[in-house]
């Protein structure tokens, strides 16, 4: 089953664009970016050429159950919720385990 669509029209206000609350109710987009709530998801994607869809409710996360404790030198950067860039999934997952699950994926690629 595909994830439910986000109805962005409910956040549009006539003449003023989108005004979002600071409510924290994270969603993960199909672009693997975590958005703080549906309204911010709509605001940040309103001018994109292609439609970003919601993947699921909650912060985006990487599956870390089958990671190796010894990592390769492969470079596929991941930005952690701590603002730090991890060189690949393996190094990110090692840090997730070390921090007992308090680290989340902010996005694929560099943080800035």
Curated annotation (Swiss-Prot):
Disulfide links within the chain: 8-42, 20-39, 28-60, 64-93, 71-90, 79-111
Gene3D superfamilies per record: 3.30.60.30
Site feature Reactive bond 2 for elastase, where: 73-74
The keyword RNA-binding is assigned to this record: no
Protein's cellular compartments: Secreted
Annotated Kazal-like domain residues: 2-62, 63-112
GO cellular component, one term: extracellular region
Organism domain of life: Eukaryota
InterPro entries documented for this protein: Bifunctional_prot_inhibitor, Kazal_dom, Kazal_dom_sf, Prot_inh_Kazal-m
Cross-referenced Pfam families: Kazal_1
Function noted in UniProt: This inhibitor is composed of two homologous actively inhibiting halves: one which inhibits trypsin, the other which inhibits elastase.
Protein name: Double-headed protease inhibitor, submandibular gland
């Amino acid at each position: 089953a595909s994830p439910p669509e986000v109805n962005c029209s409910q956040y549009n206000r006539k003449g003023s664009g989108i005004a979002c609350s600071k409510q924290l109710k994270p969603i993960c987009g199909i672009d693997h970016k975590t958005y703080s709530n549906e309204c911010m998801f709509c605001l940040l994607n309103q001018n994109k050429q292609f439609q970003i869809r919601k993947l699921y409710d909650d912060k985006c996360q990487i599956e870390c159950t089958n990671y190796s404790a010894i990592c390769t030198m492969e470079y596929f950067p991941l930005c952690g919720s701590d603002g730090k860039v991890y060189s690949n999934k393996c190094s990110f997952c090692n840090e997730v385990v070390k921090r007992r699950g308090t680290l989340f994926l902010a996005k694929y690629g560099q943080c800035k």
